[in-house]
Regions:
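Active-site loops and adjacent core secondary-structure elements that bind or stabilize anionic groups
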Residues: 1-201, 216-234
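Gly-rich Lys/Arg/Thr-decorated short loops/hinges at beta-loop-alpha junctions or inter-strand turns
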Residues: 23-35, 111-117, 193-210, 287-309, ...
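Conserved helix-loop functional segments at active or binding sites
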Residues: 53, 229, 266-270, 355, ...
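Flexible, glycine/charged-enriched surface loops at secondary-structure junctions
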Residues: 57-65, 166-169, 232-239, 269-280, ...
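Active-site-proximal loop/turn and secondary-structure-junction residues that shape catalytic pockets
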Residues: 70, 127, 239-242, 250, ...
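Glycine- and Gly-Pro-enriched alpha-helical subdomains that act as flexible
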Residues: 72-113, 244-343
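C-terminal binding/interaction regions
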Residues: 119, 123-124, 137-167, 172-174, ...
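Substrate-contacting helices/loops that form the catalytic groove of nucleic-acid
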Residues: 177-212, 270-282, 286-291
Length: 394
């Protein structure tokens, strides 16, 4: 089959809509269940490239959680800790025995659960039962993978009253070297982004501190691969094999860094005992808990703590999580990696990154203020690599 008719394009008024192969060859995907839409396929094809790249770069199964053609989270399949299992709401499952692929999706979904609500999932490996059971309990639009075990497929087919979107992709498919995009009746042509992210790209270390651990190299590569498929401008914070904050689609570089940094801060604040032990009512769903936590750790905390409000969510009124307590907890976050899809024009990005525990940075370099950026990195003992490669994605 070389074309697939879709219900509509980006919006219901944009008809007709389809995906097809211009050369008449077969599509590299098969819809096993549901009726994926235009944006679903945009997420699926971008996400599949991302997880394929992660698997190739690290040798580990990978997963990503996409929303509106940018990743909310992405990760490789490293084991979960008890704390991560709690903040990702999988501690009621057999998380200690999760498959690596299930661990990857738990991490990808868990990094920014607010943004991942209603995600499209991409998996680097054949979807197994563990991963399918994890997906089954989350609000999600669909999944793409190179295959599904029989058990996993039956589990996924039960989602959304049988309408959950399940796509299988030919993992051996190689697109043409040139890609085309039409805007306002004008066709754009460019070579595909086939750049491989590897250790050699990290070799130009420009800071006084030049000590890169193997874990830091892994996380730097992960950050750059995530940025490769994130709408620009973009910045990505990574720790322990997973994104913990993605700032996408901002016109200002420092706003990217602030956005991603705040998401990273929220990820770490959720691990504080004061948040882990919030007295939720048993009737409160995971999504409602995510929303409540997001407000509780933010500046508008009285929206959930005011009299007449806290009773809706908690069995007893929680104490305020003070600014001083939050700062003291965040000061314990260390060894975070930061990637940027283009150079940092000012050192304010580094100052903000430092507040979120960043120690390792990968960016192209090339700003007229590189010296000031390097000086600020040296002030904090950071390690920064100039990759020489821009990673814009539109």
């Amino acid at each position: 089959m070389n074309e697939l008719e879709l219900k509509y394009g980006c919006n219901p008024n944009q008809k007709p809509s389809r995906i097809y192969m211009e050369d008449g060859s077969d599509l590299p995907v098969t819809v096993l269940n549901g009726k994926p839409g235009y944006i679903n396929f945009l997420d699926a094809f971008n996400g599949w490239q991302l997880v394929s790249n992660l698997k190739k770069a690290t040798g580990l199964p990978a997963a990503t959680s996409f929303k509106h053609v940018s990743p909310a989270g992405a990760a490789v399949g490293l084991p979960l800790t008890e704390t991560l299992a709690k903040i990702y709401w999988v501690n009621d499952m057999d998380w200690k025995n999760f498959s690596p692929l299930a661990c990857a999706y738990a991490r990808a979904r868990g990094a920014d659960r607010m943004s991942s609500f209603g995600d499209f999932i991409s998996l680097s490996d054949v979807c197994d039962k563990d991963t399918a059971l994890l997906i089954k309990r989350e609000v999600s639009d669909g999944v793409i993978a190179p295959g599904y075990t029989e058990e996993a497929l039956e589990i996924l087919k039960q989602k959304k009253k049988g309408n959950y979107n399940v796509i299988q992709i030919d993992e051996n498919f190689v697109p043409a070297p040139l890609e085309h995009k039409e805007v306002f009746g004008v066709t754009f042509e460019q070579g595909r982004q086939e750049l491989e992210i590897d250790d050699a790209m990290l070799s130009n270390i420009v800071t006084e501190n030049k000590e890169l651990t193997e874990e830091a190299k892994r996380d730097m590569k992960i950050s750059l691969i995530i940025l490769k498929y994130t709408q620009s401008n973009s910045v990505c914070f990574v720790k322990d094999g997973q994104a913990i904050g993605v700032g996408a689609g901002q016109q200002s570089r420092v706003h990217c860094t602030r956005l991603a940094g705040q998401k990273a801060d929220n990820w770490f604040l959720r691990q504080c005992p004061k948040v882990l032990n919030l007295p939720f009512k048993d009737t409160i769903s995971r999504a409602e808990r995510d929303n409540a936590i997001d407000v509780y750790i933010g500046d508008e905390y009285m929206d959930v703590l005011a009299d007449g409000m806290w009773e809706k969510t908690f069995t007893e009124k929680p104490e305020v999580f003070t600014k001083e307590e939050k700062r003291a907890w965040l000061d314990q976050m260390t060894d975070v990696t930061l990637g940027s899809d283009a150079f940092f024009p000012f050192s304010d990005n580094i100052e903000r990154a430092h507040k979120s525990g960043v120690k390792y940075i990968a960016q192209p370099g090339g700003s007229v203020r590189d010296d000031a950026v390097i000086e600020t990195c040296n002030k904090y003992g950071m390690v920064m690599s100039f990759t020489g490669i821009r990673l814009f994605h539109h």
